UniProtKB/Swiss-Prot annotation:
DNA-binding protein that preferentially recognizes a curved DNA sequence. It is probably a functional analog of DnaJ; displays overlapping activities with DnaJ, but functions under different conditions, probably acting as a molecular chaperone in an adaptive response to environmental stresses other than heat shock. Lacks autonomous chaperone activity; binds native substrates and targets them for recognition by DnaK. Its activity is inhibited by the binding of CbpM. CDD domains: DnaJ, DnaJ_C. The gene is cbpA. This is Curved DNA-binding protein. Disulfide bonds: none annotated.
Length: 306
């Protein structure tokens, strides 16, 4: 049985750090991957590189491998390690060979530590109306299963029924403890993080905790004042347009914005004056009467002035 030179296989030095070894592994794994490589021995080389990475990527295993390499010419090492001529050593034999050469205590001391599972992050779209109250949502996602090389081996579908609290905001993260990937060697599971994405609304724009809505009004409604029906997230309200209102003017409706634990925002109605279509002869005459009555009014009087 031959103790392979894993450093030579990876093309690195024993003094190189994990980052350098990882870079070499990724390069060689891409080069010899059976699905893309045209090398005749690609599959064998790929397995050899993966085997070297499995040992050298683990701090404890690497230290033990270095110790084995250092003692490879000792008589005790040769008696234990070369018991089966013609067979090649691989990473799966590591535990048994190490404990045979260095004793049971060494095997116990090198057990891999408990490792926490990976966190998973998924985006959840929420409508503005749904932010007003707590609601239930069914979440489906794939739970990745990693192999010894840290690569995803398969994905297991998983479904959860979760509660989305009232008042969630865009970009808010909700933690579901232990719903990520399983831990290793008794380590805790990772977490599932729900990242809230507030879906765009056809009528409302979000400004902090407040909402803005553009309200179309006619010229005479703006001039004379009026009451118009305006939608909110809960219901429609009757909004008072004061006489002499201007285009772009913002009218505040208290308490009709977004809801959070700390405060409730307001709704701002932004007035947009909409002209009627091309006037007929009678309508044009009325506009002309208005123009004559307001002949002293100059809308550009202060134009360009600071």
């Amino acid at each position: 049985m031959e103790l392979k030179d894993y450093y030579a296989i990876m093309g690195v030095k024993p003094t190189d750090d994990l980052k350098t070894i990882k870079t070499a592994y990724r390069r060689l794994a891409r080069k010899y991957h059976p699905d893309v490589s045209k090398e005749p021995d690609a599959e064998a080389r790929f397995k050899e590189v993966a085997e070297a990475w499995e040992v050298l990527s683990d701090e404890q295993r690497r230290a033990e491998y270095d110790q084995m390499w250092q003692h490879r010419n000792d008589p005790q090492f040769n008696r234990q390690f070369h018991h089966s001529d013609g067979q090649s050593f691989n990473a799966e034999d590591f535990d048994d060979i190490f404990s045979s050469i260095f004793g049971q205590h060494a095997r116990q001391s090198r057990q891999r530590p408990a490792t926490r599972g990976h966190d998973i992050e998924i985006e959840v779209a929420v409508f503005l109306e749904e932010t007003l109250t707590e609601h239930k949502r069914t979440i489906s996602y794939n739970l990745p299963v990693y192999n010894a090389f840290g690569m995803i081996e398969q994905e297991i579908p998983k479904t959860l029924n979760v509660k989305i609290p009232a008042g969630v905001g865009n970009g808010q993260r909700i933690r579901l403890k232990g719903q990520g990937t399983p831990g290793e060697n008794g380590g805790p599971n990772g977490d599932l993080w729900l990242v809230i994405h507030i879906a765009p609304h056809p009528l409302f724009d979000i400004v902090g905790q407040d909402l803005e809505i553009v309200v179309p009004v006619s010229p005479w409604e703006a001039a004379l004042g009026a009451k118009v029906t305006v939608p909110t997230l809960k219901e429609s309200i009757l909004l008072t347009i004061p006489p002499g209102s201007q285009a772009g003017q913002r009218l505040r409706v208290k308490g009709k914005g977004l809801v959070s634990k700390k405060q409730t925002g307001d709704l701002y109605a932004v007035l947009k004056i909409v002209m009627p279509p091309k006037p007929d002869e009678n309508t044009a005459a009325l506009w002309q009467q208005l123009a004559d009555a307001q002949s002293s009014f100059d809308p550009r009087k202060d134009w360009g002035k600071a």
